[in-house]
Amino acid sequence: MIVDNSKDFDLKSFLANLTTHSGVYRMLDKHGEIIYVGKAKNLKNRVNSYFSKGAKDSKTLMMVEQIARIEITITPSDYEAYLLENNLIKQHRPKYNILFKDDKSYPYLVISRDKFPRVSFYRSKSAYKKGQCFGPYVSISSVKNTLNTIQKIFPIRQCENSYYKSRVRPCLQYQIKCCLAPCVGLVSQQQYDEQLAILKKFLAGKFSSVLEEISAKMYQASEDMEYEKAQVYRDQLVVLRKLQQQQIVDIQEDKTFDVIGIYMQDSYASIALLQIQNGDVVADRHWSIDAKGQDKTSIMHAFLSHFYLGDEIRNIWPKNIILSKVEFADITDLMNSISQKIGQAINWIIAPAADNLKWLKLAEVNARQKLNIYTSSKSQYQKRLESLKEFLELEKDIKRIECFDISHFQGEATIASCVVYTDDGEDRKSHRRYNIKDIKSGDDYAAIHQAVSRRVSSGLEADNLPDVMIIDGGKGQIHQAEAVFREYGIQDKVQLVSLGKGIERISGKEKIYKGFDDTEYTLDEHNPGFLLLRQVRDSAHDHAIKGQRKKVSANRQSSIIEEIEGVGPKRRKALMMYFGGWQELSRASVDEIAKVKGISKKLAQEIWECFH
C-alpha cells in the first residue's frame, strides 16, 4: 500500500525540535519505504546536516530529494546506537546505505542445547539460535571432515532429534563406538558431559589442553583399574596424535588477528578479510559493493559495523585488527563499541610495518583481484539485461525476473520451481518450489497454470510481482500463463515470455514467444539477451529437478512398506519407533524385524524381502 507521508510531515518543525541525544534516524520516502538508516551521537546536529548548505555528493543530494519523513529512536549510549543501526540496515536493506553481501554463506558446527546435545552443522549465521557455535569453516567439505574426525574421537551423537527420540535400542553408531547411546540410557549425564567438555575445547583449538586432559583421564582410569574406560581414552589419544602429526596445531590467541584490505575503482569497492592464526591464513572472505559517492573511510566504517557488530560467530576473536589506511578519528567510537561487544580490548593497526604490512598488502591484492572479477561479471550481466530489455521492447529497466519450470517423475511427484534474478544477479534466497496438487498425471499445462496462479495471487497481495516472467516451454505453456494474467488483469504489469526447444530440441535454437503474441521469435545463440534467458531457464530447471528428486525419494521410502499387505499405519509406526528409520530397517535381519510388536515371522520375512 502506498502512503504519501510528505503532506502531513512538517520537516522544518521536526528539525527544530530534534533531541541532542544519541540515537538512530531513519529516512523514509513518500511510499513509506526506509531509504537510509544512520546513527549519531547528536541526532539534532547530524540530521540537520543533510538539509544545511554545503558540499554534498550526488548520492546524498539524490537521497535528500526523496525524503518525505524522518523517524528517530533515542538510545542510552553510542554503543546501543551502533547495534540498532546495524540491525535495521540488515532488516530493511535501505537503498542508500552501503550494503554488504557475503560471497557465500559459511558453515558452522553447532552443539545443541538438548539434555544430551548433538553436534551438527548449519550453513547459516542463524546457527547461533540452535546452540553453541564453532566456526565459520571455509567450506562444506572442511566442516564435514571435522564432523568425521569428531565422530572418530568423541562419541557424541550427531543424529536428528526425531531419530534420537524414537530409539528403543542402540543404533549402528553405538556398535562401532562412535556414539555413547544416550537415547537408550547407556551413558550417564556426567560421562556424556565430560566428553562434551573435551569436544568443546577441541573445537576451540585448545589442542594441547585436550591431549593433556585425555592423557590424565587415561592414567587415572588405569590406576582405578577401569581398563575399558582407559582403553577408550587411549584410542582417542591415538587419533589425536595422528592429527597432530598432520600439523594441526594449537591456536595461540595473541597470534590470532584479522586483516582488512580495501580496493576501490570507479564506483565500486571490494573488501578482503584474512583471518590469520599462527602465521597461517585460515580463512579469507570477500565483499564487493557499489560504492558511488563513498570514500574509503565510510566504507570501512560500514564494514566494521556490519561484520563485528552483527551476528558473526567466532570461537576466538582477534587481539589485533589490521586495516587499510583510513581517518582514524572517524571510527574511534565504532572501535570502542566493537571492543565492548566482543568483550576484550583490540589493538587496531592502521599503519602497519614489517610482517603486518605484508599481510595488509596480501589482503589488498585479494580485494583488487576480487573486484576485477566482480566488475567484469557485473558488466557482462548488465549487458545481458539491457539486451533482453531491448528484445522485449520494455520502457523501464528490468529489476526482477522470475522463471517457472515443471518437473515430475513418470507423471507423479510434480514440482514447479520458481527462480529469481534481480538487477544484481541470481537471488537464491528468493527461489521457491510449489508442490502441485489435484491435477491429472503428467499434465504440465495444468501444473504451470496452478503455479503461476499461486505466484500472481501472492505477488499482488505483497506488491512484489516481477518485471519479467519466463515460462520454460512453448505455446501451450505460455497460453496457460496468459490465462492467469487475464484472470488477474496484469497483462500490462508483467512481461511474459517463454523459451522452448521446439521440435528440433537443439540447444541454442530455442523458440521464444512473448506474452499475448503468437509470433515465434529466434535469437542468435550468442545474443546477450538470449544467453540471459537460457541462464535463468537452466537455473529453474536445475532447481525443479532437485526438488522433484527429494520428493520422489521421500515417497519411495514410505511406499515400499505401504505395498505390503498387512502393514498398515499402526505397524509402520511401530517399525519406525523400533528401528528409528528406513535405513536401519533395511539393514535388520528377519529375526530382528519379528521382534517388533505386531509383526509375525512371516510378515517379517515379507518386509525383509522388500529391501533385498
From Swiss-Prot:
Gene3D superfamilies: 5' to 3' exonuclease, C-terminal subdomain, GIY-YIG endonuclease, UVR domain, UvrC, RNAse H endonuclease domain
Keywords per UniProt: Cytoplasm, DNA damage, DNA excision, DNA repair, Excision nuclease, SOS response
Species assigned in the record: Francisella tularensis subsp. tularensis (strain SCHU S4 / Schu 4)
Function: The UvrABC repair system catalyzes the recognition and processing of DNA lesions. UvrC both incises the 5' and 3' sides of the lesion. The N-terminal half is responsible for the 3' incision and the C-terminal half is responsible for the 5' incision.
InterPro entries noted in UniProt: GIY-YIG_endonuc (IPR000305), GIY-YIG_endonuc_sf (IPR035901), GIY-YIG_UvrC_Cho (IPR047296), RuvA_2-like (IPR010994), UVR_dom (IPR001943), UVR_dom_sf (IPR036876), UvrABC_protein_C (IPR050066), UvrC (IPR004791)
Domain UVR: 208-243
Compartments, as annotated in UniProt: Cytoplasm
Pfam families per record: GIY-YIG (PF01541), HHH_5 (PF14520), UVR (PF02151), UvrC_RNaseH (PF22920), UvrC_RNaseH_dom (PF08459)
Domain GIY-YIG: residue ranges: 20-98
Main location: cytoplasm
UniProt keyword Membrane present: no
Assembly and oligomerization: Interacts with UvrB in an incision complex.
Protein name: UvrABC system protein C
CDD domains in alphabetical order: GIY-YIG_UvrC_Cho (cd10434)
Stated family: Belongs to the UvrC family.
Top-level division of the source organism's lineage: Bacteria
SMART domains: GIYc
Gene this chain is encoded by: uvrC
GO cellular component, one term: excinuclease repair complex
MF-aspect GO terms: DNA binding; excinuclease ABC activity
GO biological process: nucleotide-excision repair; SOS response
